[in-house]
Amino acid sequence: LAHRLYPAVYKLMSMGRIAGESIEPEKFVSDTVARDDKRLVTLTYDDMGMPSLSVTPPYDEDDIKEVTADQQRATQDPVSAFLLPVRATDTPCARTIPIFDGKRRFNLTFAHQGTKKIAPHDTSAPDGWGPSLDTIVCTMHYEAITPPAKKRRFTTVLRRNDEMKIWFAPFNDGRVYLPVRFEIPTPLGAAVMELNDLTATKSASLGRDEKSALVVSAQESTRF
């Protein structure tokens, strides 16, 4: 059903560094096939956090001219935005993250709602369920910055919805939280995205800056 209503395939990849309680993205790639539209978007970040955009086929100039250089600087991509580093026992939820996806500039604000133990789906497990995870549940609010929100179906749902929830679980010895479940109410009922498989590797040192790297490969499923 979800595929019939939103016929699209998204392949997203993000590379970057964990620096304290933030992520410093280095590269983001989005390979999208939606209906008759195919597009490859790449964002490459310099040392000052300024992204350089490459798009094939190119966007129309009118689609991206409103997002200024100042608005793009020190933002995160749509994948690294959901990797939430923490110190000690701090909650990952109390933060607002500025995001630029190559076309739109928007904020995501997370707020702590509670804790919950969940068992995500695992297609490789005999019973179809993975091990239980202790998660922190956050609400999420979407705020369009530039360009002003347009009447696109998905962004309209995001803008009008203050009941979106994300379940974050601790990884990397509790120093970073990753989303394992995402729920958004829609006119057809709740759309649920769950983590099916996760492979993570880390590098203890990247040189003098003493920042650590986390490379994550994940598979998710969406259902209504």
Regions found by a protein language model. Give the residues of each.
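A charged, solvent-exposed segment within the mature domains of Sec-exported extracytoplasmic proteins
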Residues: 38-105
